[in-house]
Protein backbone atom coordinates (compact mmCIF):
# COMPACT_ATOMS: atom_id res chain seq x y z
CA UNK A 1 0.00 0.00 0.00
CA UNK A 2 2.97 2.28 0.25
CA UNK A 3 3.55 2.50 -3.48
CA UNK A 4 0.18 4.15 -4.33
CA UNK A 5 0.69 6.55 -1.44
CA UNK A 6 4.12 7.50 -2.76
CA UNK A 7 2.67 7.96 -6.22
CA UNK A 8 -0.11 10.12 -4.86
CA UNK A 9 2.36 12.23 -2.90
CA UNK A 10 4.56 12.62 -5.96
CA UNK A 11 1.61 13.65 -8.11
CA UNK A 12 0.46 16.08 -5.45
CA UNK A 13 3.94 17.59 -5.28
CA UNK A 14 4.10 17.94 -9.07
CA UNK A 15 0.65 19.55 -9.21
CA UNK A 16 1.62 21.91 -6.41
CA UNK A 17 4.78 22.89 -8.26
CA UNK A 18 2.86 23.43 -11.51
CA UNK A 19 0.20 25.44 -9.67
CA UNK A 20 2.86 27.56 -7.99
CA UNK A 21 4.61 28.15 -11.30
CA UNK A 22 1.33 29.01 -13.02
CA UNK A 23 0.25 31.31 -10.19
CA UNK A 24 3.56 33.11 -10.15
CA UNK A 25 3.55 33.55 -13.92
CA UNK A 26 0.05 35.06 -13.71
CA UNK A 27 1.55 37.92 -11.73
CA UNK A 28 3.77 38.96 -14.65
CA UNK A 29 2.52 42.08 -16.42
CA UNK A 30 3.97 44.02 -19.33
CA UNK A 31 3.45 47.61 -20.45
CA UNK A 32 4.44 48.82 -23.91
CA UNK A 33 5.06 52.56 -24.34
CA UNK A 34 4.49 53.65 -27.92
CA UNK A 35 6.03 57.08 -27.33
CA UNK A 36 9.48 55.64 -26.55
CA UNK A 37 9.31 52.22 -28.28
CA UNK A 38 9.98 50.39 -25.02
CA UNK A 39 8.31 47.80 -22.80
CA UNK A 40 8.56 47.05 -19.09
CA UNK A 41 7.97 43.53 -17.73
CA UNK A 42 6.91 43.59 -14.07
CA UNK A 43 5.98 41.13 -11.33
CA UNK A 44 9.37 39.55 -10.68
CA UNK A 45 11.01 39.04 -7.28
CA UNK A 46 14.69 39.53 -6.50
CA UNK A 47 17.46 37.16 -5.42
CA UNK A 48 20.55 39.37 -5.44
CA UNK A 49 23.95 37.96 -4.61
CA UNK A 50 25.67 40.29 -2.16
CA UNK A 51 28.45 38.02 -0.87
CA UNK A 52 30.10 34.61 -0.95
CA UNK A 53 30.13 31.61 1.37
CA UNK A 54 33.25 29.43 1.15
CA UNK A 55 33.60 25.84 2.26
CA UNK A 56 36.47 23.36 2.03
CA UNK A 57 35.74 19.97 0.46
CA UNK A 58 38.15 17.07 0.96
CA UNK A 59 38.76 13.65 -0.55
CA UNK A 60 41.10 11.28 1.28
CA UNK A 61 43.54 9.48 -1.01
CA UNK A 62 45.57 6.32 -0.69
CA UNK A 63 49.34 6.01 -0.83
CA UNK A 64 49.60 3.04 -3.15
CA UNK A 65 53.09 1.70 -2.59
CA UNK A 66 52.96 -1.70 -4.21
CA UNK A 67 50.81 -3.80 -6.46
CA UNK A 68 51.88 -7.43 -6.28
CA UNK A 69 49.09 -8.88 -8.30
CA UNK A 70 49.99 -10.02 -11.80
CA UNK A 71 47.01 -12.27 -12.37
CA UNK A 72 45.27 -12.70 -15.69
CA UNK A 73 41.74 -12.72 -14.33
CA UNK A 74 39.52 -10.27 -16.25
CA UNK A 75 38.19 -8.70 -13.07
CA UNK A 76 41.71 -8.24 -11.72
CA UNK A 77 42.75 -6.56 -14.96
CA UNK A 78 39.84 -4.15 -14.64
CA UNK A 79 40.88 -3.32 -11.09
CA UNK A 80 44.47 -2.71 -12.18
CA UNK A 81 43.25 -0.44 -14.99
CA UNK A 82 41.23 1.56 -12.49
CA UNK A 83 44.25 1.82 -10.20
CA UNK A 84 46.32 3.16 -13.10
CA UNK A 85 43.63 5.76 -13.82
CA UNK A 86 43.61 6.66 -10.15
CA UNK A 87 47.40 7.16 -10.12
CA UNK A 88 47.30 9.29 -13.27
CA UNK A 89 44.55 11.45 -11.80
CA UNK A 90 46.52 12.12 -8.63
CA UNK A 91 49.63 12.97 -10.66
CA UNK A 92 47.59 15.36 -12.79
CA UNK A 93 46.27 17.06 -9.66
CA UNK A 94 49.81 17.40 -8.30
CA UNK A 95 50.94 19.13 -11.47
CA UNK A 96 47.83 21.28 -11.60
CA UNK A 97 48.38 22.43 -8.02
CA UNK A 98 51.64 24.11 -9.05
CA UNK A 99 49.84 26.44 -11.45
CA UNK A 100 46.86 27.50 -9.36
CA UNK A 101 46.86 31.08 -8.01
CA UNK A 102 46.79 29.84 -4.43
CA UNK A 103 50.18 28.18 -4.79
CA UNK A 104 53.21 29.97 -3.39
CA UNK A 105 56.90 29.10 -3.45
CA UNK A 106 56.75 27.41 -0.09
CA UNK A 107 53.93 25.14 -1.17
CA UNK A 108 55.82 24.21 -4.33
CA UNK A 109 58.87 23.21 -2.29
CA UNK A 110 56.58 21.01 -0.19
CA UNK A 111 54.96 19.32 -3.19
CA UNK A 112 53.77 15.93 -1.89
CA UNK A 113 55.81 12.92 -2.90
CA UNK A 114 53.71 10.28 -1.15
CA UNK A 115 52.75 8.52 -4.39
CA UNK A 116 55.38 6.01 -5.59
CA UNK A 117 54.95 6.61 -9.28
CA UNK A 118 56.11 9.23 -11.76
CA UNK A 119 55.39 10.31 -15.28
CA UNK A 120 57.84 9.73 -18.07
CA UNK A 121 60.37 12.55 -18.26
CA UNK A 122 58.91 13.95 -15.05
CA UNK A 123 61.10 17.01 -14.75
CA UNK A 124 60.60 18.35 -18.25
CA UNK A 125 56.94 17.38 -18.32
CA UNK A 126 56.21 19.12 -15.05
CA UNK A 127 57.76 22.35 -16.23
CA UNK A 128 55.99 22.27 -19.59
CA UNK A 129 52.57 21.41 -18.20
CA UNK A 130 52.95 23.95 -15.43
CA UNK A 131 53.72 26.79 -17.84
CA UNK A 132 50.82 25.86 -20.11
CA UNK A 133 48.40 25.75 -17.22
CA UNK A 134 49.64 29.06 -15.87
CA UNK A 135 48.88 30.78 -19.15
CA UNK A 136 45.49 29.10 -19.36
CA UNK A 137 44.65 29.99 -15.79
CA UNK A 138 45.54 33.65 -16.28
CA UNK A 139 43.21 33.82 -19.24
CA UNK A 140 40.40 32.20 -17.28
CA UNK A 141 41.03 34.43 -14.27
CA UNK A 142 40.58 37.54 -16.41
CA UNK A 143 37.17 36.19 -17.36
CA UNK A 144 35.88 35.66 -13.83
CA UNK A 145 37.45 38.88 -12.50
CA UNK A 146 37.28 39.31 -8.75
CA UNK A 147 34.44 36.82 -8.33
CA UNK A 148 36.69 34.11 -6.92
CA UNK A 149 38.75 36.39 -4.68
CA UNK A 150 37.29 35.06 -1.42
CA UNK A 151 37.74 31.45 -2.52
CA UNK A 152 41.34 32.12 -3.55
CA UNK A 153 42.02 33.71 -0.16
CA UNK A 154 40.84 30.57 1.67
CA UNK A 155 42.68 28.36 -0.78
CA UNK A 156 45.96 30.17 -0.14
CA UNK A 157 45.68 29.62 3.60
CA UNK A 158 45.45 25.86 3.04
CA UNK A 159 48.98 25.94 1.64
CA UNK A 160 50.40 27.12 4.94
CA UNK A 161 52.17 24.64 7.20
CA UNK A 162 49.83 22.50 9.27
CA UNK A 163 46.54 23.64 7.75
CA UNK A 164 45.80 20.41 5.90
CA UNK A 165 46.66 18.32 8.96
CA UNK A 166 44.34 20.52 11.01
CA UNK A 167 41.48 19.76 8.63
CA UNK A 168 42.41 16.09 8.41
CA UNK A 169 42.38 15.75 12.20
CA UNK A 170 39.02 17.51 12.48
CA UNK A 171 37.49 15.01 10.03
CA UNK A 172 38.83 11.85 11.64
CA UNK A 173 35.59 10.86 13.34
CA UNK A 174 33.10 12.88 11.30
CA UNK A 175 32.44 13.91 7.72
CA UNK A 176 31.79 17.55 8.56
CA UNK A 177 33.49 20.01 10.93
CA UNK A 178 34.12 23.73 11.40
CA UNK A 179 37.86 24.48 11.34
CA UNK A 180 39.52 27.74 12.37
CA UNK A 181 42.31 28.54 9.92
CA UNK A 182 45.47 30.39 10.84
CA UNK A 183 44.15 33.63 9.33
CA UNK A 184 41.34 33.66 11.90
CA UNK A 185 38.62 32.60 9.47
CA UNK A 186 36.43 29.64 10.38
CA UNK A 187 35.30 27.46 7.49
CA UNK A 188 33.01 24.48 7.22
CA UNK A 189 34.97 21.47 5.95
CA UNK A 190 33.40 18.32 4.54
CA UNK A 191 34.82 14.93 3.60
CA UNK A 192 32.80 13.76 0.61
CA UNK A 193 34.84 10.71 -0.40
CA UNK A 194 37.18 8.41 1.53
CA UNK A 195 39.19 6.55 -1.09
CA UNK A 196 41.99 5.87 1.39
CA UNK A 197 40.07 3.51 3.64
CA UNK A 198 38.40 1.80 0.72
CA UNK A 199 41.60 1.22 -1.26
CA UNK A 200 43.85 0.36 1.68
CA UNK A 201 41.46 -1.81 3.69
CA UNK A 202 39.14 -3.33 1.11
CA UNK A 203 40.62 -3.23 -2.38
CA UNK A 204 44.39 -3.73 -2.08
CA UNK A 205 44.17 -6.68 0.33
CA UNK A 206 42.18 -8.48 -2.37
CA UNK A 207 44.28 -7.66 -5.42
CA UNK A 208 47.59 -8.20 -3.60
CA UNK A 209 46.74 -11.76 -2.65
CA UNK A 210 48.97 -14.31 -4.31
CA UNK A 211 45.93 -15.95 -5.84
CA UNK A 212 44.88 -12.63 -7.39
CA UNK A 213 41.30 -13.79 -7.47
CA UNK A 214 38.22 -11.59 -7.14
CA UNK A 215 35.12 -13.58 -6.39
CA UNK A 216 32.54 -11.20 -7.87
CA UNK A 217 32.23 -8.30 -10.26
CA UNK A 218 30.61 -6.08 -7.62
CA UNK A 219 34.04 -5.22 -6.22
CA UNK A 220 35.13 -3.93 -9.62
CA UNK A 221 31.93 -1.94 -10.11
CA UNK A 222 32.14 -0.41 -6.64
CA UNK A 223 35.69 0.79 -7.18
CA UNK A 224 34.84 2.14 -10.63
CA UNK A 225 31.99 4.17 -9.17
CA UNK A 226 34.09 5.57 -6.36
CA UNK A 227 37.06 6.22 -8.62
CA UNK A 228 34.90 7.84 -11.29
CA UNK A 229 34.18 10.83 -9.06
CA UNK A 230 37.88 11.52 -8.56
CA UNK A 231 38.54 11.11 -12.29
CA UNK A 232 35.77 13.54 -13.22
CA UNK A 233 36.90 16.11 -10.65
CA UNK A 234 40.44 15.85 -12.04
CA UNK A 235 39.19 16.24 -15.59
CA UNK A 236 37.12 19.33 -14.73
CA UNK A 237 39.96 21.03 -12.88
CA UNK A 238 42.42 20.18 -15.66
CA UNK A 239 40.21 21.41 -18.49
CA UNK A 240 39.25 24.60 -16.62
CA UNK A 241 42.69 25.41 -15.20
CA UNK A 242 41.77 24.85 -11.59
CA UNK A 243 38.56 26.92 -11.43
CA UNK A 244 35.20 25.57 -12.54
CA UNK A 245 31.74 27.04 -12.81
CA UNK A 246 29.03 25.90 -12.54
CA UNK A 247 29.71 23.48 -9.70
CA UNK A 248 29.00 20.00 -11.03
CA UNK A 249 27.45 17.07 -9.19
CA UNK A 250 30.92 15.51 -9.07
CA UNK A 251 32.25 18.44 -7.05
CA UNK A 252 29.16 18.38 -4.83
CA UNK A 253 26.26 15.98 -5.11
CA UNK A 254 22.76 17.36 -4.65
CA UNK A 255 22.49 15.92 -1.15
CA UNK A 256 25.89 17.38 -0.21
CA UNK A 257 24.91 20.77 -1.62
CA UNK A 258 21.59 20.80 0.23
CA UNK A 259 23.38 19.82 3.43
CA UNK A 260 25.87 22.63 2.92
CA UNK A 261 23.07 25.15 2.29
CA UNK A 262 21.36 24.02 5.48
CA UNK A 263 24.57 24.74 7.44
CA UNK A 264 25.03 28.23 6.00
CA UNK A 265 24.57 31.18 8.41
CA UNK A 266 21.53 32.59 6.59
CA UNK A 267 17.81 32.96 7.27
CA UNK A 268 15.32 30.17 6.69
CA UNK A 269 13.83 32.12 3.77
CA UNK A 270 17.24 32.30 2.13
CA UNK A 271 17.84 28.58 2.72
CA UNK A 272 14.45 27.78 1.22
CA UNK A 273 15.18 29.97 -1.78
CA UNK A 274 18.53 28.26 -2.44
CA UNK A 275 17.19 24.75 -1.81
CA UNK A 276 14.34 25.30 -4.28
CA UNK A 277 16.69 26.63 -6.94
CA UNK A 278 19.67 24.29 -6.73
CA UNK A 279 20.50 24.53 -10.45
CA UNK A 280 20.70 28.32 -10.33
CA UNK A 281 22.88 28.10 -7.21
CA UNK A 282 25.22 25.74 -9.07
CA UNK A 283 25.43 28.11 -12.04
CA UNK A 284 26.48 31.00 -9.81
CA UNK A 285 28.99 28.99 -7.74
CA UNK A 286 32.69 28.16 -8.20
CA UNK A 287 34.95 25.28 -7.26
CA UNK A 288 38.64 26.12 -6.87
CA UNK A 289 41.49 23.61 -6.83
CA UNK A 290 43.56 24.19 -3.70
CA UNK A 291 46.03 21.53 -2.59
CA UNK A 292 46.86 17.83 -2.63
CA UNK A 293 48.93 17.01 0.44
CA UNK A 294 49.11 14.56 3.36
CA UNK A 295 46.98 12.09 1.38
CA UNK A 296 44.23 14.69 1.12
CA UNK A 297 42.81 16.49 -1.90
CA UNK A 298 41.26 19.78 -0.79
CA UNK A 299 39.31 22.20 -2.96
CA UNK A 300 37.20 25.23 -2.13
CA UNK A 301 33.54 25.54 -3.08
CA UNK A 302 32.29 29.12 -3.21
CA UNK A 303 28.51 29.53 -2.96
CA UNK A 304 26.49 32.73 -3.48
CA UNK A 305 24.93 34.56 -0.55
CA UNK A 306 21.62 36.15 -1.57
CA UNK A 307 21.44 39.11 0.80
CA UNK A 308 18.52 40.79 -0.98
CA UNK A 309 15.44 38.69 -1.70
CA UNK A 310 11.76 39.25 -2.49
CA UNK A 311 12.06 42.92 -3.55
CA UNK A 312 10.30 43.97 -6.80
CA UNK A 313 12.21 43.54 -10.06
CA UNK A 314 11.38 44.57 -13.61
CA UNK A 315 12.98 44.30 -17.02
CA UNK A 316 13.16 47.08 -19.60
CA UNK A 317 13.15 46.18 -23.30
CA UNK A 318 13.95 48.85 -25.92
CA UNK A 319 14.00 49.06 -29.70
CA UNK A 320 14.88 51.82 -32.23
CA UNK A 321 12.29 54.57 -32.70
CA UNK A 322 12.62 56.35 -36.06
CA UNK A 323 10.71 58.81 -38.20
CA UNK A 324 8.95 57.33 -41.21
CA UNK A 325 9.62 59.74 -44.05
CA UNK A 326 9.30 58.18 -47.47
CA UNK A 327 12.49 59.83 -48.70
CA UNK A 328 15.34 57.40 -48.12
CA UNK A 329 18.11 58.67 -45.85
CA UNK A 330 16.03 61.48 -44.38
CA UNK A 331 14.95 59.69 -41.19
CA UNK A 332 16.30 60.15 -37.68
CA UNK A 333 16.28 57.54 -34.89
CA UNK A 334 16.35 57.45 -31.11
CA UNK A 335 16.78 54.42 -28.84
CA UNK A 336 16.63 54.13 -25.07
CA UNK A 337 19.91 52.67 -23.79
CA UNK A 338 18.77 51.90 -20.25
CA UNK A 339 17.53 48.39 -21.08
CA UNK A 340 18.23 45.62 -18.58
CA UNK A 341 17.08 44.32 -15.20
CA UNK A 342 16.13 46.59 -12.30
CA UNK A 343 15.57 45.56 -8.68
CA UNK A 344 14.69 47.61 -5.62
CA UNK A 345 17.53 47.50 -3.12
CA UNK A 346 17.57 49.39 0.21
CA UNK A 347 15.84 52.56 -1.00
CA UNK A 348 17.65 52.70 -4.34
CA UNK A 349 17.61 50.61 -7.48
CA UNK A 350 20.19 48.03 -8.58
CA UNK A 351 20.51 48.19 -12.38
CA UNK A 352 21.93 45.26 -14.35
CA UNK A 353 22.65 46.52 -17.89
CA UNK A 354 23.74 43.07 -19.09
CA UNK A 355 20.43 41.28 -18.73
CA UNK A 356 21.93 37.93 -19.72
CA UNK A 357 24.03 37.88 -16.52
CA UNK A 358 20.82 37.43 -14.53
CA UNK A 359 19.14 34.03 -14.35
CA UNK A 360 15.35 33.79 -14.30
CA UNK A 361 13.48 30.92 -12.69
CA UNK A 362 9.70 31.33 -12.93
CA UNK A 363 9.19 34.84 -11.51
CA UNK A 364 12.47 34.86 -9.55
CA UNK A 365 15.45 36.87 -10.83
CA UNK A 366 18.92 35.80 -9.68
CA UNK A 367 21.48 38.57 -10.23
CA UNK A 368 24.99 39.36 -9.02
CA UNK A 369 25.40 42.83 -7.50
CA UNK A 370 28.99 42.81 -8.75
CA UNK A 371 27.48 43.41 -12.22
CA UNK A 372 25.15 46.20 -11.10
CA UNK A 373 24.97 49.98 -10.96
CA UNK A 374 23.18 51.78 -8.13
CA UNK A 375 20.58 54.29 -9.36
CA UNK A 376 18.02 56.51 -7.61
CA UNK A 377 14.43 55.33 -7.52
CA UNK A 378 13.49 58.21 -9.88
CA UNK A 379 14.86 56.13 -12.75
CA UNK A 380 11.33 54.68 -12.99
CA UNK A 381 10.09 58.03 -14.28
CA UNK A 382 11.78 57.37 -17.63
CA UNK A 383 9.12 54.80 -18.43
CA UNK A 384 6.17 57.16 -18.09
CA UNK A 385 7.82 60.52 -18.93
CA UNK A 386 11.19 60.45 -20.64
CA UNK A 387 11.41 64.26 -20.42
CA UNK A 388 10.88 64.34 -16.65
CA UNK A 389 13.06 66.88 -14.77
CA UNK A 390 14.01 64.56 -11.90
CA UNK A 391 16.07 61.96 -13.79
CA UNK A 392 18.04 62.39 -17.01
CA UNK A 393 17.05 59.42 -19.15
CA UNK A 394 19.65 57.69 -21.32
CA UNK A 395 19.33 57.44 -25.09
CA UNK A 396 21.35 57.02 -28.27
CA UNK A 397 20.74 58.67 -31.64
CA UNK A 398 21.40 57.82 -35.26
CA UNK A 399 20.21 58.46 -38.78
CA UNK A 400 20.05 54.79 -39.77
CA UNK A 401 16.59 53.25 -39.61
CA UNK A 402 17.34 49.53 -39.25
CA UNK A 403 14.39 47.17 -38.84
CA UNK A 404 14.50 44.70 -35.95
CA UNK A 405 12.47 42.98 -33.26
CA UNK A 406 12.99 42.58 -29.50
CA UNK A 407 11.39 39.60 -27.79
CA UNK A 408 9.92 40.56 -24.43
CA UNK A 409 8.52 38.48 -21.58
CA UNK A 410 4.95 38.55 -22.94
CA UNK A 411 5.33 39.53 -26.60
CA UNK A 412 7.56 41.40 -29.03
CA UNK A 413 8.48 44.97 -29.98
CA UNK A 414 8.75 45.42 -33.74
CA UNK A 415 10.68 48.30 -35.32
CA UNK A 416 9.77 48.20 -39.00
CA UNK A 417 11.19 50.76 -41.44
CA UNK A 418 11.78 51.29 -45.13
CA UNK A 419 10.71 48.52 -47.45
CA UNK A 420 11.19 45.74 -44.88
CA UNK A 421 8.23 43.40 -44.48
CA UNK A 422 7.30 42.74 -40.85
CA UNK A 423 4.65 40.21 -39.79
CA UNK A 424 3.33 38.25 -36.81
CA UNK A 425 2.22 34.66 -37.36
CA UNK A 426 0.32 31.85 -35.72
CA UNK A 427 1.54 28.32 -36.39
CA UNK A 428 -1.97 27.21 -37.36
CA UNK A 429 -3.41 30.33 -39.03
CA UNK A 430 -0.32 31.77 -40.70
CA UNK A 431 0.22 35.54 -40.87
CA UNK A 432 -2.23 37.29 -38.57
CA UNK A 433 -0.74 40.79 -38.58
CA UNK A 434 1.37 42.92 -40.92
CA UNK A 435 3.18 45.84 -39.31
CA UNK A 436 3.29 49.25 -40.92
CA UNK A 437 6.34 51.52 -40.75
CA UNK A 438 7.16 52.62 -37.23
CA UNK A 439 7.44 51.01 -33.81
CA UNK A 440 4.72 48.61 -32.71
CA UNK A 441 4.07 45.83 -30.21
CA UNK A 442 2.30 42.48 -30.27
CA UNK A 443 1.47 40.27 -27.28
CA UNK A 444 2.14 36.54 -27.30
CA UNK A 445 -1.56 35.69 -27.17
CA UNK A 446 -2.24 33.81 -30.40
CA UNK A 447 1.21 34.73 -31.76
CA UNK A 448 4.01 32.19 -32.15
CA UNK A 449 6.56 33.98 -34.33
CA UNK A 450 7.50 37.44 -35.52
CA UNK A 451 9.22 37.94 -38.86
CA UNK A 452 11.30 41.01 -39.76
CA UNK A 453 12.65 40.71 -43.27
CA UNK A 454 14.36 37.32 -43.45
CA UNK A 455 14.76 37.00 -39.67
CA UNK A 456 12.35 34.87 -37.67
CA UNK A 457 11.81 35.41 -33.93
CA UNK A 458 10.02 33.00 -31.58
CA UNK A 459 8.00 34.73 -28.86
CA UNK A 460 7.97 33.57 -25.24
CA UNK A 461 4.88 31.66 -24.19
CA UNK A 462 4.82 32.91 -20.62
CA UNK A 463 1.41 33.75 -19.22
CA UNK A 464 0.58 37.27 -18.13
CA UNK A 465 -1.24 40.49 -18.91
CA UNK A 466 -0.07 42.99 -21.55
CA UNK A 467 -0.96 46.68 -21.74
CA UNK A 468 -0.46 48.94 -24.79
CA UNK A 469 0.15 52.57 -23.72
CA UNK A 470 -0.42 54.82 -26.73
CA UNK A 471 1.43 58.09 -27.25
CA UNK A 472 2.99 60.33 -29.87
CA UNK A 473 6.46 58.99 -30.79
CA UNK A 474 8.90 61.45 -29.23
CA UNK A 475 11.14 61.29 -32.29
CA UNK A 476 8.50 63.36 -34.11
CA UNK A 477 9.22 66.25 -31.74
CA UNK A 478 12.70 66.71 -33.19
CA UNK A 479 13.77 68.64 -36.30
CA UNK A 480 15.90 66.42 -38.57
CA UNK A 481 17.99 69.47 -39.58
CA UNK A 482 19.35 69.98 -36.06
CA UNK A 483 19.03 66.43 -34.66
CA UNK A 484 22.47 65.13 -33.53
CA UNK A 485 23.41 61.77 -35.00
CA UNK A 486 25.63 58.96 -33.66
CA UNK A 487 25.35 59.88 -29.98
CA UNK A 488 25.96 56.44 -28.46
CA UNK A 489 26.08 57.29 -24.76
CA UNK A 490 24.00 60.38 -24.22
CA UNK A 491 20.99 61.58 -22.29
CA UNK A 492 17.89 63.56 -23.11
CA UNK A 493 19.39 66.77 -21.68
CA UNK A 494 22.63 66.32 -23.64
CA UNK A 495 20.76 65.78 -26.89
CA UNK A 496 18.54 68.79 -26.22
CA UNK A 497 21.61 70.88 -25.38
CA UNK A 498 23.23 69.96 -28.68
CA UNK A 499 20.00 70.81 -30.47
CA UNK A 500 19.91 74.20 -28.71
CA UNK A 501 23.54 74.78 -29.67
CA UNK A 502 22.69 74.00 -33.28
CA UNK A 503 19.69 76.34 -33.16
CA UNK A 504 21.84 79.09 -31.58
CA UNK A 505 24.42 78.61 -34.31
CA UNK A 506 21.72 78.90 -36.96
CA UNK A 507 20.36 82.08 -35.34
CA UNK A 508 23.84 83.58 -35.20
CA UNK A 509 24.39 82.70 -38.82
CA UNK A 510 21.09 84.34 -39.74
CA UNK A 511 22.08 87.48 -37.84
CA UNK A 512 25.43 87.65 -39.57
CA UNK A 513 23.78 87.08 -42.91
CA UNK A 514 21.21 89.75 -42.11
CA UNK A 515 23.96 92.22 -41.16
CA UNK A 516 25.86 91.47 -44.33
CA UNK A 517 22.72 91.91 -46.40
CA UNK A 518 21.91 95.11 -44.54
CA UNK A 519 25.39 96.48 -45.29
CA UNK A 520 25.04 95.54 -48.89
CA UNK A 521 21.64 97.29 -49.05
CA UNK A 522 23.08 100.53 -47.57
CA UNK A 523 25.92 100.54 -50.07
CA UNK A 524 23.52 99.94 -52.92
CA UNK A 525 21.30 102.79 -51.75
CA UNK A 526 24.27 105.18 -51.55
CA UNK A 527 25.49 104.22 -54.99
CA UNK A 528 21.99 104.55 -56.38
CA UNK A 529 21.60 107.95 -54.72
CA UNK A 530 24.90 109.18 -56.13
CA UNK A 531 23.99 107.96 -59.58
CA UNK A 532 20.61 109.64 -59.32
CA UNK A 533 22.23 112.89 -58.14
CA UNK A 534 24.71 112.76 -61.00
CA UNK A 535 21.93 112.07 -63.45
CA UNK A 536 19.90 114.95 -61.98
CA UNK A 537 22.90 117.28 -62.25
CA UNK A 538 23.57 116.19 -65.81
CA UNK A 539 19.96 116.62 -66.73
CA UNK A 540 19.94 120.05 -65.07
CA UNK A 541 23.01 121.11 -67.03
CA UNK A 542 21.50 119.85 -70.24
CA UNK A 543 18.27 121.67 -69.46
CA UNK A 544 20.10 124.97 -68.76
CA UNK A 545 22.10 124.57 -71.95
CA UNK A 546 19.01 123.92 -73.99
CA UNK A 547 17.28 126.86 -72.37
CA UNK A 548 20.12 129.22 -73.23
CA UNK A 549 20.31 127.86 -76.71
CA UNK A 550 16.62 128.27 -77.32
CA UNK A 551 16.70 131.80 -75.91
CA UNK A 552 19.58 132.70 -78.15
CA UNK A 553 17.73 131.48 -81.21
CA UNK A 554 14.59 133.42 -80.44
CA UNK A 555 16.35 136.96 -80.17
CA UNK A 556 16.34 139.12 -83.63
CA UNK A 557 19.65 140.56 -85.12
CA UNK A 558 19.83 144.47 -85.54
CA UNK A 559 22.50 146.18 -87.79
CA UNK A 560 23.76 149.71 -87.22
CA UNK A 561 23.81 152.43 -89.92
CA UNK A 562 27.50 152.13 -90.36
CA UNK A 563 27.20 148.41 -90.90
CA UNK A 564 24.51 148.96 -93.47
CA UNK A 565 26.43 151.67 -95.30
CA UNK A 566 29.43 149.39 -95.23
CA UNK A 567 27.52 146.67 -96.81
CA UNK A 568 26.16 148.95 -99.39
CA UNK A 569 29.54 150.35 -100.12
CA UNK A 570 30.91 146.93 -100.48
CA UNK A 571 28.12 145.95 -102.76
CA UNK A 572 28.55 148.95 -104.96
CA UNK A 573 32.26 148.86 -104.97
CA UNK A 574 32.28 145.96 -107.28
Swiss-Prot record:
<feature type="glycosylation site" description="N-linked (GlcNAc...) asparagine; by host">
    <location>
        <position position="70"/>
    </location>
</feature>
<feature type="glycosylation site" description="N-linked (GlcNAc...) asparagine; by host">
    <location>
        <position position="116"/>
    </location>
</feature>
<feature type="disulfide bond">
    <location>
        <begin position="322"/>
        <end position="333"/>
    </location>
</feature>
<keyword id="KW-1160">Virus entry into host cell</keyword>
<feature type="topological domain" description="Extracellular">
    <location>
        <begin position="26"/>
        <end position="524"/>
    </location>
</feature>
<keyword id="KW-0325">Glycoprotein</keyword>
<protein>
    <recommendedName>
        <fullName>Fusion glycoprotein F0</fullName>
    </recommendedName>
</protein>
<comment type="similarity">
    <text>Belongs to the paramyxoviruses fusion glycoprotein family.</text>
</comment>
<dbReference type="GO" id="GO:0046718">
    <property type="term" value="P:symbiont entry into host cell"/>
</dbReference>
<dbReference type="InterPro" id="IPR000776">
    <property type="entry name" value="Fusion_F0_Paramyxovir"/>
</dbReference>
<keyword id="KW-1133">Transmembrane helix</keyword>
<keyword id="KW-0449">Lipoprotein</keyword>
<keyword id="KW-0732">Signal</keyword>
<keyword id="KW-0812">Transmembrane</keyword>
<feature type="disulfide bond">
    <location>
        <begin position="313"/>
        <end position="343"/>
    </location>
</feature>
<feature type="disulfide bond">
    <location>
        <begin position="382"/>
        <end position="393"/>
    </location>
</feature>
<keyword id="KW-0946">Virion</keyword>
<keyword id="KW-1032">Host cell membrane</keyword>
<keyword id="KW-1169">Fusion of virus membrane with host cell membrane</keyword>
<keyword id="KW-1015">Disulfide bond</keyword>
<feature type="coiled-coil region">
    <location>
        <begin position="76"/>
        <end position="96"/>
    </location>
</feature>
<feature type="signal peptide">
    <location>
        <begin position="1"/>
        <end position="25"/>
    </location>
</feature>
<keyword id="KW-0175">Coiled coil</keyword>
<dbReference type="GO" id="GO:0016020">
    <property type="term" value="C:membrane"/>
</dbReference>
<feature type="disulfide bond">
    <location>
        <begin position="416"/>
        <end position="422"/>
    </location>
</feature>
<dbReference type="GO" id="GO:0098670">
    <property type="term" value="P:entry receptor-mediated virion attachment to host cell"/>
</dbReference>
<feature type="glycosylation site" description="N-linked (GlcNAc...) asparagine; by host">
    <location>
        <position position="126"/>
    </location>
</feature>
<dbReference type="GO" id="GO:0060141">
    <property type="term" value="P:symbiont-mediated induction of syncytium formation"/>
</dbReference>
<feature type="transmembrane region" description="Helical">
    <location>
        <begin position="525"/>
        <end position="550"/>
    </location>
</feature>
<keyword id="KW-1043">Host membrane</keyword>
<feature type="glycosylation site" description="N-linked (GlcNAc...) asparagine; by host">
    <location>
        <position position="120"/>
    </location>
</feature>
<feature type="glycosylation site" description="N-linked (GlcNAc...) asparagine; by host">
    <location>
        <position position="500"/>
    </location>
</feature>
<keyword id="KW-0564">Palmitate</keyword>
<feature type="disulfide bond">
    <location>
        <begin position="358"/>
        <end position="367"/>
    </location>
</feature>
<keyword id="KW-1162">Viral penetration into host cytoplasm</keyword>
<feature type="coiled-coil region">
    <location>
        <begin position="153"/>
        <end position="209"/>
    </location>
</feature>
<feature type="lipid moiety-binding region" description="S-palmitoyl cysteine; by host">
    <location>
        <position position="550"/>
    </location>
</feature>
<feature type="region of interest" description="Fusion peptide">
    <location>
        <begin position="137"/>
        <end position="157"/>
    </location>
</feature>
<keyword id="KW-0472">Membrane</keyword>
<dbReference type="GO" id="GO:0020002">
    <property type="term" value="C:host cell plasma membrane"/>
</dbReference>
<keyword id="KW-1161">Viral attachment to host cell</keyword>
<keyword id="KW-1040">Host Golgi apparatus</keyword>
